């Protein structure tokens, strides 16, 4: 998918007025003549758009996770730098018990790590691609003599995405909810 220029897709979409047609046309431009007739066979708009959304989220989660990891590491460094500095902790805006100036930094670093764990789960389990036709039953693949489930699995693996084993026209929103919760 990296060989398809997003600017080319936008250019084609401006001409066609349809995002999926533009993606299919961009795919056809890079495929062999033998493969071109099959670009849209057995796929629906939802197959294309949901897979594209998963790929966008995959890229975004990488950027977000890297930023959070960097911030966590900075906080851990600050925690270590301040571990021997005595400070007064507070509760309800009143002085409480002595602590170190580094403890709050370590606390926030731990909270960020918890968020990273949620992001990692969403990244590894909730980015769903599909290629299953209008009902998710892979009828068109069967007509072509292909194993539709294997086609979908291979397609999604090549993109670094998970796939549903019992798909429908659209995948459930639970997967997107996992990602939103993690964020």
Describe each region flagged by the PLM.
Residues 163-174:
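Active-site-adjacent structural elements in folded domains
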Residues 172-183:
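A conserved active-site cap/scaffold subdomain adjacent to cofactor or substrate pockets
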Residues 1-138, 146-154, 163:
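A helix-coil-helix interface module used to build multimeric assemblies
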Residues 158:
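Metal- and O2-centered redox machinery and metal/ROS homeostasis
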Residues 142:
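Catalytic cores of enzymes that engage adenine nucleotides and/or redox cofactors via long glycine-rich
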């Amino acid at each position: 998918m990296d060989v398809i220029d997003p600017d080319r897709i936008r250019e084609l979409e401006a001409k066609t007025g349809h995002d999926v047609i533009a993606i299919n046309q961009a795919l056809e431009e890079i495929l062999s003549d033998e493969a071109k007739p099959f670009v849209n066979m057995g796929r629906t708009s939802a197959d294309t758009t949901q897979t594209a959304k998963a790929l966008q989220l995959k890229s975004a989660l990488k950027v977000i996770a890297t930023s959070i990891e960097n911030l966590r590491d900075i906080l851990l460094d600050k925690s270590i730098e301040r571990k021997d500095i005595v400070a007064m902790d507070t509760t309800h805006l009143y002085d409480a018990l002595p602590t170190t100036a580094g403890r709050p930094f370590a606390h926030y670093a731990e909270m960020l790590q918890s968020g990273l764990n949620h992001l990692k789960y969403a990244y590894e389990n909730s980015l769903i691609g599909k290629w299953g036709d209008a009902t998710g039953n892979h009828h068109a693949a069967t007509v072509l003599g292909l194993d539709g489930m294997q086609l979908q699995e291979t397609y999604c693996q090549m993109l670094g995405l998970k796939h549903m084993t019992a798909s429908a026209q659209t995948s459930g929103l639970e997967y997107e909810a996992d990602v939103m919760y993690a964020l």
